[in-house]
C-alpha cells in the first residue's frame, strides 16, 4: 500500500486517538483530518476540537457532528425491532455504533479528498473488524490505517510513555488513575481493562458510570408507558418524542432505578474471550417494552421464526457485517414482522429491573373471549381439541409402536 497523503481519523479526543493523531503525523508525514461523532456519550466535544488544534490540525480539517438522531433512528431502532442480543445478554451497544462512524469516515474522506481512514481499535478486539468491514463495504478502494497493528506501542504503559514524551495530556479517572478502556454512546457504556481483566474479581462499584447501584435505587417502583408504532418507540407517557429523545429519557429512568447493568464474558470474533462491564439503562427498558408489545400483536408463527433468526442477526452486527446482504435480508424480514407491532406497554421500574405489567393495542391478537376460564359464549369449542391432539399424536404413536416392536 502506497503511503497516504491525507487520512481521516476517527478521533475521540481521548488518549489513544490523540497518540494516533501524533503518530500518523510523524510516521506517515501525512495531513490528518479528524472526525468526532456525538453519539450521546455525554461528553463535551469542544475539548476534542481544541486538542486537535493543539496537535496541529487545521480548523477546516476538524469535523465534529451531532449524529444522535441518525444513530438511534437508522441503527439502534432497526436492531431493537429484532430484539437483538449477542450470546443472550449483550445489547450490542458498541457494535451498532461502528457502522455509522465508518459511514461518516468514508463520506468525509470523499468530501475532503482523503485517500485513507484510520481508527483507534486494537489488534486484539472486534472494533478493528467492524470499522474496516464497514469501510470496505461502502468504498472498496479506501485505504485503512490501523496503528495498533503497525506500531511498537504494544502496551498501555508504552502508550503513556509516548504521550508524556510528546506532551499529550493524560486524563485521570475520579480516583486519580489512568481510566479504564471506555466506550460510550446513547445506548450504552462499556468498561474494560485493569482489574476487570480477572474474571474472578467482582467489579468495583466505581466502574459503573451510568447507573446507580440497584441497592441504592428508590424504594418505591415507578411506572411508565411506552407507545410503539410499527416496532419503534414513538412516545413516553403519551408525549411524542424523537428517537434520540426517547432513548435519552429512558436512560434517565434507567439510571435512577439502577437498570441495565451487565458483567459479561463474551466470545470475541477474533477468537478470545473478553470481560466487560456494560450499562444500557434505556436499552434494557426499551427491549422489555418491545417484547411486551410483540406478545399481543405478533402472530405466533411469525414470532417464533423471528426468534429463531435473532441470534444470527445479532452475530452479524457483533462481527461487523451491518452492511452485508445477509443482514439486510434479515432486516427486511424483521421489518415485515413489525407492521402491526403498534400499541402501548406499561413497564414497572424497580431496583435494577424493568418488567412489563400491562400492554394494549388496536392491533392485538389477544382474545379474552377465547382464553377465559369463564363462560366463553361459544367462542371456542373444547371438543375440537380432541381431533387436534389425535392428529398431532399420530407420529408419536407410530414411533412408540415401532420401538416396542423393534428392540
UniProtKB/Swiss-Prot annotation:
Binding positions (L-aspartate): 122, 126-127
Record's protein name: Argininosuccinate synthase
Enzyme class: ligase
PANTHER family: ARGININOSUCCINATE SYNTHASE (PTHR11587:SF2)
Entry EC number(s): 6.3.4.5
Keywords on record: Amino-acid biosynthesis, Arginine biosynthesis, ATP-binding, Cytoplasm, Ligase, Nucleotide-binding
Family: Belongs to the argininosuccinate synthase family. Type 1 subfamily.
One GO BP: urea cycle
UniProt signal peptide: none
Subunit structure: Homotetramer.
Binding site for ATP: 10-18, 37, 120
Organism, as annotated: Ruegeria sp. (strain TM1040) (Silicibacter sp.)
Annotated InterPro entries: Arginosuc_syn_C, Arginosuc_syn_N, Arginosuc_synth, Arginosuc_synth_CS, Arginosuc_synth_type_1_subfam, AS_cat/multimer_dom_body, Rossmann-like_a/b/a_fold
Superkingdom assignment: Bacteria
Main subcellular location: cytoplasm
